[in-house]
Amino acid sequence: MTLSFLDQFASQSFLGIPLIAIAILIPWMLFPSPYKRWMSNRLITFQSWFIARTTNQLMLPLNTGAHKWAMILTALLLFLMTLNLLGLLPYTFTPTTQLSMNMALAVPLWLATVLIGMRNQPTHSLAHLLPEGTPTPLIPILIIIETISLFIRPLALGVRLTANLTAGHLLIQLISTATFVMLSIMPTIATLTFIVLALLTILEIAVAMIQAYVLVLLLSLYLQENV
């Protein structure tokens, strides 16, 4: 029976343990709930500090009216960051490498920012379609260009996250395959490629966290224009 390379990700169990149970337990272990004690442990303290720090950074450039989005943006950041980091584990599938999922997250949130602007301050929101000081003959062209750029925003959010994560996973796959193949033929070269693989994995951990932050940061900037 011939199996494709991607069939290894379709396994329903690993070492006799259902993968659905592991998939449910790992996020629960990463984000423990606080308990009623005078002093929290180090993990909960770090978790609370990280969430508070991230929320402050996201809400810093926004006015008071946009602070009600703090919970949504912070939850989205933690959700994307968790999926990106878990996707770096061997033999795991990364949902955020799928454009359909990223677009399903980006389009509704982008549309919500646009609708809020059109409802609360339509004149200010429509003013973004025409830069100040535009010559009269260029007004129709610039309005069309700005409208197209407005509708491209959610596509750019989804494609950016998908492309960066997919490229990193492909590089890790290629270098790890080369390391495994050359291990018995050229051990010295295999050692060098393994070092490159370790450095690339560290880089991909940083990319996984940065790309989640960039997507949420851009959403907060879009929100700033309409609130």
Swiss-Prot record:
Signal sequence, renumbered to the chain: none
GO cellular component, one term: proton-transporting ATP synthase complex
Pfam family, one: ATP-synt_A
Chief localization: mitochondrion
Keyword annotations of the record: ATP synthesis, CF(0), Hydrogen ion transport, Ion transport, Membrane, Mitochondrion, Mitochondrion inner membrane, Transmembrane, Transmembrane helix, Transport
Membrane-spanning intervals of the chain: 14-34, 69-89, 98-118, 139-159, 165-185, 189-209
UniProt-annotated location(s): Mitochondrion inner membrane
GO terms, molecular function: proton channel activity; proton-transporting ATP synthase activity, rotational mechanism
InterPro entries from the UniProt entry: ATP_synth_F0_asu, ATP_synth_F0_asu_AS, ATP_synth_F0_asu_bact/mt, F0_ATP_A_sf
Family per similarity comment: Belongs to the ATPase A chain family.
Subunit structure: Component of the ATP synthase complex composed at least of ATP5F1A/subunit alpha, ATP5F1B/subunit beta, ATP5MC1/subunit c (homooctomer), MT-ATP6/subunit a, MT-ATP8/subunit 8, ATP5ME/subunit e, ATP5MF/subunit f, ATP5MG/subunit g, ATP5MK/subunit k, ATP5MJ/subunit j, ATP5F1C/subunit gamma, ATP5F1D/subunit delta, ATP5F1E/subunit epsilon, ATP5PF/subunit F6, ATP5PB/subunit b, ATP5PD/subunit d, ATP5PO/subunit OSCP.
Job of this protein: Subunit a, of the mitochondrial membrane ATP synthase complex (F(1)F(0) ATP synthase or Complex V) that produces ATP from ADP in the presence of a proton gradient across the membrane which is generated by electron transport complexes of the respiratory chain. ATP synthase complex consist of a soluble F(1) head domain - the catalytic core - and a membrane F(1) domain - the membrane proton channel. These two domains are linked by a central stalk rotating inside the F(1) region and a stationary peripheral stalk.
Name used for this protein in its record: ATP synthase F(0) complex subunit a
High-level lineage: Eukaryota, Metazoa, Chordata, Craniata, Vertebrata
